C-alpha cells in the first residue's frame, strides 16, 4: 500500500546501543542479585524497581538519560528475573530487606528510589521503614494501596499461565496487558521474559511472587493512610491514563496521603510509562529528581 510505513523494530539492544552500562551480579545479604548499572559511581545513587513478575529490562529505555546525573541501578528484585529465589512466599518485608541489603552491597547510604507497580509498593514501604536511606521517592503506577479482586485475579491468571507454559502467546499476553498500545508485538521484551520464565523451577518462583495476590497476605502488606503519612522524602506519584491496575483517582488518592507529594499524569500509557513513552517519563522523572540540585 502506497505510503504505508513499516513499523520501527524495537529491541532491548537498540535501546542500550551506545550506552556505557554494565550487567552483573552481586551478593545482597546472601542473595545473588542481578543488576544493570550505568553512570559514574561519583554521582548520587538512583535505584529502579520493576513490577510483579518483571525484571531489570523494564528500564532499558531510561538508563542513558539517568546515567548523566545518577549512578543508576536497575535490579532484578528478590525471586525475580535471574536474582536468587528464597523458596517461600514473598511479602513486602522480604523485598525491603533484600533492597536494603543491596544498598549496603553497593555502599549507598542514601538513594533516590523509583518503583513501578510492585516496585513502587516496595519503595514506599522502604521510605516508611528506613526514612534515612531515601532521598527522593517516585511511585510509578504503584501497588500497595488497595485490593481490587478483579485486578488481582487477572494478574494471577496471566502470570501463572505464562510461567506454567511460557509460550510466545502466553508471555505476550502478559506483556500486552501492561501496555496501552495492544497493537505492538513487544517481541524483544517477550523473548527476554520468556527466557526468564523457562528457567527450571520458575513455576514455583512465580507462585511465591504471586503471594501478594492472596487476599489475606495482601491485606497485611497494604499501606494505609498512616503509613503514607509517615513518608518524609519528597515524593512524586506518577500515574497514567490507561493503567490496568487502578484508575487515575487512586493515584491522586495516594498522592493526597503523602505530605507534600507531587502528582503527574501521563496520557496514552498503561502500566509501563517509563517504556511506553520514555521521553515524557524521563522529562518528568528527572525534573523531579534533579529539582533543587546543583547543575
Go through each PLM region and give its residues.
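Alpha/beta-hydrolase fold catalytic core
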Residues: 1-45, 69-70, 108-109, 286-295
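Conserved HGGG/HGGXW glycine-rich cap/lid loop of the alpha/beta-hydrolase fold
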Residues: 31, 36-82
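Conserved alpha/beta-hydrolase catalytic His-Asp/Glu region
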Residues: 33, 150, 168-229
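Conserved acidic catalytic loop of the alpha/beta-hydrolase fold
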Residues: 93-111
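Flexible "cap/lid" loop of the alpha/beta hydrolase fold
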Residues: 124, 128, 135-169
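Short beta-strand/loop motif that positions the catalytic acidic residue
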Residues: 231, 237-239
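Acidic catalytic loop of the alpha/beta-hydrolase fold
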Residues: 242-246
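Catalytic active-site module of serine/aspartate enzymes centered on a nucleophile-bearing elbow/loop
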Residues: 260-295
Amino acid at each position: 500500500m502506497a505510503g504505508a510505513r513499516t513499523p520501527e523494530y524495537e529491541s532491548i539492544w537498540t535501546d542500550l546501543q551506545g550506552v556505557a552500562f554494565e550487567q552483573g551480579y552481586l551478593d545482597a545479604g546472601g542473595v545473588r542479585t542481578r543488576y544493570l548499572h550505568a553512570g559514574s559511581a561519583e554521582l548520587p545513587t538512583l535505584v529502579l524497581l520493576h513490577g510483579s513478575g518483571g525484571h531489570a529490562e523494564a528500564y532499558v529505555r531510561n538508563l542513558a538519560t539517568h546515567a548523566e546525573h545518577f549512578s543508576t541501578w536497575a535490579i532484578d528484585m528478590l525471586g525475580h528475573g535471574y536474582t536468587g529465589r528464597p523458596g517461600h512466599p514473598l511479602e513486602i518485608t522480604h523485598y525491603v530487606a533484600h533492597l536494603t541489603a543491596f544498598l549496603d552491597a553497593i555502599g549507598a547510604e542514601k538513594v533516590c528510589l523509583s518503583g513501578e507497580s510492585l516496585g513502587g509498593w516496595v519503595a514506599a514501604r522502604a521510605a516508611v521503614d528506613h526514612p534515612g536511606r531515601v532521598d527522593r521517592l517516585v511511585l510509578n503506577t504503584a501497588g500497595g494501596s488497595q485490593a481490587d479482586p478483579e485486578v488481582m485475579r487477572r494478574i494471577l491468571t496471566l502470570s501463572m499461565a505464562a510461567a506454567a507454559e511460557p509460550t510466545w502467546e502466553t508471555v505476550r499476553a502478559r506483556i500486552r496487558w501492561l501496555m496501552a498500545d495492544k497493537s505492538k508485538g513487544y517481541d524483544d521484551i517477550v523473548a527476554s521474559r520468556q527466557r526468564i520464565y523457562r528457567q527450571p523451577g520458575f513455576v514455583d518462583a512465580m507462585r511465591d511472587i504471586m503471594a501478594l495476590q492472596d487476599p489475606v497476605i495482601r491485606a497485611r502488606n497494604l499501606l494505609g493512610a498512616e503509613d503514607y503519612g509517615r513518608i518524609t522524602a519528597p515524593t512524586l506519584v506518577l500515574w497514567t491514563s490507561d493503567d490496568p491496575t487502578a484508575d487515575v483517582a487512586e493515584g491522586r488518592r495516594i498522592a493526597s496521603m503523602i505530605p507534600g507529594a507531587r502528582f503527574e499524569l501521563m496520557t496514552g500509557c498503561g502500566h509501563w510509562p517509563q517504556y511506553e513513552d520514555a521521553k515524557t517519563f524521563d522529562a518528568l522523572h528527572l525534573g523531579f529528581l534533579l529539582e533543587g540540585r546543583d547543575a
